Amino acid sequence: MAYRIHGPRKTVLFVPDIDRWDAPSVGPEFIESLFDGVDVAYVDATFYDGREIPGRNLLMIPHPAMIDSMELFAEHVKRKPGSIRFIHLNHTNPALHNPSVIEEVEGRGFLIARPEERTKL
C-alpha cells in the first residue's frame, strides 16, 4: 500500500506497510515511478535485517528488511539525500536505539523519521 500526497509545494510518498519490494507486481520501473517527483518518502522499515528476531524466518514475515530497502534505494538517495525516511520500526529494530546503526543508516543517505514529524506540503 502506498499513497502519494500532492500539496502546493511538495509531494510526499507514504508507504506505511508493504509486504516486499520484489513481489511480481512490483518491478524496478514501478518502484522508480513511485518515487518520481517525490520530495519526501516515508517508507516501512519494520525490521532491520532479521537478526533482531532470532528463530524467525524474515522471508515469512511480510515486511522488507531495512537493509534491503537501503540497497534498493541507494541510487535514489545519492541524488536526493534525506528524501527517504524510515517509519513503522518494530521495537526490536536496532535503528531505533543503536547509535552505530543509526549512524550507518544516515551515512547511507537515509533518515529515520522522528515522532510526530511533519512535512509542509
Where are these regions (language model features)?
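Active-site beta-strand termini and strand-to-loop segments that position acidic
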Residues: 4-8
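Short Fe-S-cluster ligation motifs
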Residues: 121
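Cap/insert and terminal regions of metallo-dependent hydrolase folds
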Residues: 9-11, 19-118
